[in-house]
């Protein structure tokens, strides 16, 4: 039996390093950053949720359900994940950031295969050198664990998943897959990369 997989695109941060600009809505080669992300993951999942804590009306224009953190105060990616986990009845939830326009087109099948091979609860993507803590495939049933972790004052995603049976799936064959945009300079470099 095939697994049902939904996705959440995290666009709920404050983007301090981008001068406060909403990263998902910043244009890259004529399209909003989040549109590049949507195009990469849409063929791989059933439903997409967008986690946003500002500009919700603009995000809704992309045609997907927009959800805001149930824990207020910009508490980081865990808050967005918790909210999304409560909004899906899928077997797995794919978590990706809004500012990774080169995500692998085989992200879900490889991460799902890694989970099943190890009978794990979570798959974490890696670029071959570093884990990508906000590129995850996980079971929504882990929501209570994540919620307790956040409510205890913790914020680091990797500290949370280290408490569970997780597997790392390397995408070293796609070294630019997880390049993201945190500064205007990175945006300029990435725009050049995409046009190559």
UniProtKB/Swiss-Prot annotation:
Database matches in InterPro entries? MobA-like_NTP_Trfase, Molybde_CF_guanTrfase, Nucleotide-diphossugar_trans
| Cofactor(s) for this UniProt protein | Mg(2+)
Q: Where does Mg(2+) bind?
A: 99
Group of enzyme by EC: transferase
Protein residues bound to GTP: 10-12, 23, 51, 69, 99
Q: Which GO terms describe its molecular function?
A: GTP binding; metal ion binding; molybdenum cofactor guanylyltransferase activity
Keyword Magnesium assigned:
yes
Enzyme Commission numbers on file: 2.7.7.77
- Catalytic activity as recorded in UniProt: Mo-molybdopterin + GTP + H(+) = Mo-molybdopterin guanine dinucleotide + diphosphate
Q: What cellular-component terms does GO give this entry? A: cytoplasm
What this chain does, per the record?
Transfers a GMP moiety from GTP to Mo-molybdopterin (Mo-MPT) cofactor (Moco or molybdenum cofactor) to form Mo-molybdopterin guanine dinucleotide (Mo-MGD) cofactor.
Record's family?
Answer: Belongs to the MobA family.
| Annotated protein name in UniProt | Molybdenum cofactor guanylyltransferase
Native species? Shewanella baltica (strain OS155 / ATCC BAA-1091)
Lineage of origin: Bacteria, Pseudomonadati, Pseudomonadota, Gammaproteobacteria, Alteromonadales
Gene assigned in the entry: mobA
